[in-house]
Structures are given as C-alpha cells and as structure tokens.
C-alpha cells in the first residue's frame, strides 16, 4: 500500500510511505547516496535503506509524524464529524444559489470534505480567479486531471470549481465561502 502524507494525514507535501510485507523482494527504481554505509561501493540491499535514495526528508517526516499524532489525539470520528458538518453546510448554501450544482450529489452522502461545483454558464477558471482575487479563497478550478469524468458530466468545456474543507475550517469560514461564491457567480454572469 502506498500513501501520501499531505492528504488526510496533515503531513507536508513530499511525504508518504510504502507498506509492504517483510519478505517482499523489491528493487529500488533509483539508487544513490547512503548515509549509513558511506564508503560502500554498492547501495545497501537491506530494508528500508535499499529503497532510500539520497537524504531522508527528516523535516517532512517530522511534520508527518505531528499530523498523525494530531489525528490520534483528536480522534478520527471527531475529525470526520466536523468535516461532514461543514461540508454539508457548504453544499446546502451552494445549492441555494441559482445555476450552481454540486457534482456527485449532496445531502446524506458520507464523503470527504471535497466538493466540486458546476456553475451554469460560468467558466470555472474565471470563478476560481475571482474567489482568490476578491475574497482570498483558494479553490482548484479546471478539469482536475480527470477530463473523461468532465466529458461524462458535460462539464468538459468549463470544468468545475473544487472546494476542500478540513477540520481546521470553521463554520464562519464556510459561511463566508457561500457569500463569496454567490457574489462571484452573480458578478460573472
């Protein structure tokens, strides 16, 4: 199993891991600089050093460890409950704006804090830019590396705007996001 540290584990970008069975014979893709056997002519063959090319990202791994500690201390259920609550708040507010639809449905769906919206007649890039420029709200606009999904949804020409919520967001921030979305959509029509 491979995982990235910056999605849901609150670690920095560039962190992650690989969980394998102890006896799996796996060869590294890239070899290089070993801090444990500096004068050996060959790269270490024992795990995990065999898969570590170059300097270990110690600062990043410390950040990942802090993120995992936060999850353990806060609790997965508490984090999930808050994210679900504020995500539902946003979905309900967004759907009250004429021409805005939540892609993938909403209401009662157990999912992450990621909400993609389609705004009838509004290019997603223009909306994303307006939210950033006028409101300081960072979203992701476009095709999200999924052009076939957008073709199936009928949004391949304008894309979608994706909002991402975490347990660190507040209900006040979500309310501001709804106001910003409504005003930005109205300004772009």
Language-model-detected regions and their locations in the chain:
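Short beta-strand-to-loop capping motifs
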Residues: 20, 117-121, 165
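Conserved PLP-binding catalytic core of the aspartate aminotransferase-like
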Residues: 84, 88, 99-147, 152-153
């Amino acid at each position: 199993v491979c995982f990235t540290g910056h999605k849901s584990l609150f670690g920095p970008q560039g962190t992650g891991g690989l969980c394998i069975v102890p006896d799996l014979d796996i060869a590294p893709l890239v070899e290089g600089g070993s801090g444990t056997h500096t004068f050996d002519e060959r790269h270490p063959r024992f795990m995990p050093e065999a898969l570590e090319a170059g300097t270990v990202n110690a600062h990043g791994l410390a950040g990942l460890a802090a993120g995992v500690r936060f999850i353990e201390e806060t609790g997965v259920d508490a984090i999930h409950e808050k994210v679900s609550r504020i995500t539902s708040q946003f979905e309900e507010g967004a759907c009250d704006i004429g021409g805005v639809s939540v892609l993938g449905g909403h209401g009662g769906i157990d999912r992450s804090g990621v909400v993609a919206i389609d705004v009838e007649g509004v290019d997603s890039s223009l909306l994303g830019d307006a939210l950033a420029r006028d409101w300081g709200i960072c979203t992701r606009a476009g095709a999200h590396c999924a052009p076939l999904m957008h073709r199936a949804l009928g949004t391949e020409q304008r894309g979608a705007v994706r909002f991402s919520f975490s347990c660190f967001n507040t209900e006040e921030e979500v309310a501001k996001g709804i106001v910003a979305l409504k005003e930005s959509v109205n300004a772009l029509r």
